Amino acid sequence: MGGRGIDLAIVGAGPAGCGLAAALRLQGWGGAITLLEIGRGPGGRAATRRSRQDPTLAINHGAPLFNIRGGPEPALLEPLRSGGWIEPFPGAIHSLDGEGQLGPAIDDGFSDGSLYQGRGGMEQLSRGLLALAQGSPGATELRSGCLVRHLQPEAEGWTLTGADGAPLLQCRWLVLSGTLLAHH
């Protein structure tokens, strides 16, 4: 088990968790960060699944793209673009009705603004954010394949316990970046 040397534990390494780690590093925060992810790597529900039988078949699920609209561009956008992690979305957005008919995009605001996708799959957004966090001063660690089963508040922070009941780590601060524990 990791000791109290971990300042911040982030449960979930999707765009929210990796984005938080990258934003903290961009702001100059030097505390030790550990991200815990149940999946094989970063991405969470913004990922691309590939067929084992057909390597050309790839399906984005969850968040197939993201948009930036209104206000100034987020500071993390340019390093993600220039690092090759994301690219403009070149396609068109359509809707599919209950009859299976293709129609125009629904006017819900989600397809407005500048649209981006991960280059090579949506998990590249999270991989890029994680790379930005790891390339900055301060320790940033990703623990993949790590199920957090229980959160125990302590006098000076938190103890996180795994599926087998054994403590995973202790930390000063804790962020839950998704609905993760609701599934178990």
Q: What is each PLM-predicted segment?
A:
Residues 9-11, 36, 148, 167-183:
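Short hydrophobic core segments
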Residues 9-13, 23-53:
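Glycine-rich FAD pyrophosphate-binding loop
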Residues 65-72, 101-131, 143:
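Short beta-strand to alpha-helix junction loop
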Residues 17-18:
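N-terminal Rossmann-fold NAD(P) dinucleotide-binding loop
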Residues 3-9:
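Extreme N-terminal starter segment of soluble prokaryotic enzymes
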Residues 29, 47-94:
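N-terminal FAD cofactor-binding segment of flavoenzymes
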Residues 141-159:
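A conserved short coil-to-beta-strand element within the FAD-binding core of flavoproteins
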Residues 31, 84, 131-141, 155:
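A short helix-to-beta-strand connector/capping loop
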